[in-house]
Amino acid sequence: MAHKSKILIIGGTGYIGKFIVEASAKSGHPTFALVRESTVSDPVKGKLVEKFKGLGVTLLHGDLYDHESLVKAFKQVDVVISTVGHLQLADQVKIIAAIKEAGNIKRFFPSEFGNDVDRVHAVEPAKTAFATKAEIRRKTEAEGIPYTYVSSNFFAGYFLPTLAQPGLTSPPREKVVIFGDGNARAVFNKEDDIGTYTIRAVDDPRTLNKIVYIKPAKNIYSFNEIVALWEKKIGKTLEKIYVPEEKLLKDIQESPIPINVILAINHSVFVKGDHTNFEIEASFGVEASELYPDVKYTTVEEYLQQFV
């Protein structure tokens, strides 16, 4: 059996982090999670930490802002996967510095898991978040650290349960608001699958110093196509309200945080088409479902079925 790298996840109790921790543990990689003392005693995150222990995950106490704790943790593993949240993206320079000092890390996955930030046409406030991720890429490359960037596009759990309708808790059954003309195609991936594909990439030479795009054929839909699929499932035609780009841009400017960030990402994806408006070239990227055709991913159609 091939050697399986030891993997450390930073931000493992966060939204996408927990899926990556679980995928790593279940795939037989020796799995480590960096946790702060405060996380263990947190009522919600503490439960997750207990779940990790049950999966055989080793907890390493440390903190993004404690350089020595990072170096000590990194010396025990081969691969570092960062899944830190929005507010800590810029602070990943601290991870890079500790990787340089530790000197043994075979691969670094910075916190990405969305659009390919080198190929976006975003407005503020999403523009700055994307630019911060791009800066972390450049810093990683400049330091000569081996890397993989996972561009997993949309989390299914963010979009599909409500079809991006604000204030709803299930998909709409009367009317639906559609951004732009509804024709730009986007990609929707279930979080478990993002975890699975990410871990598969860890020891794969084909993904070294590349962007891994998670774009399975059955998960690429325009907004109009998703609405049509949902209408077919519920046997009903919805009233469609199209929001022109100018109106969406105005809404972004007038909305509070985090609504403005979400709307700006929706603008990038559904108006500018930033998930699908470029070709993946072998010089910079590979596509996960082509690399790992044996992974049985959840399709958009299967995902929506639970809400019918």
Curated annotation (Swiss-Prot):
One of its GO terms (molecular function) is oxidoreductase activity. Disulfide bonds: none annotated. NADP(+) binds at G11, G12, T13, G14, Y15, I16, G17, R36, K45, R137. It comes from the Eukaryota. The keyword Oxidoreductase applies. The keyword Oxidoreductase applies. Keywords: Allergen, NADP, Oxidoreductase. It holds the Pfam family NmrA. InterPro entries: NAD(P)-bd_dom_sf (IPR036291), NmrA-like (IPR008030), NmrA-type/Isoflavone_red_sf (IPR050608), PCBER-like (IPR045312). It catalyses: (-)-dehydrodiconiferyl alcohol + NADPH + H(+) = (S)-isodihydrodehydrodiconiferyl alcohol + NADP(+); (+)-dehydrodiconiferyl alcohol + NADPH + H(+) = (R)-isodihydrodehydrodiconiferyl alcohol + NADP(+). Its EC number is 1.23.1.-. The active site is at K133 (proton acceptor). Oxidoreductase involved in lignan biosynthesis. Catalyzes the NADPH-dependent reduction of phenylcoumaran benzylic ethers. Converts dehydrodiconiferyl alcohol (DDC) to isodihydrodehydrodiconiferyl alcohol (IDDDC). Belongs to the NmrA-type oxidoreductase family. Isoflavone reductase subfamily. This is Phenylcoumaran benzylic ether reductase Betv6. It comes from Betula pendula (European white birch). The gene is BETV6.
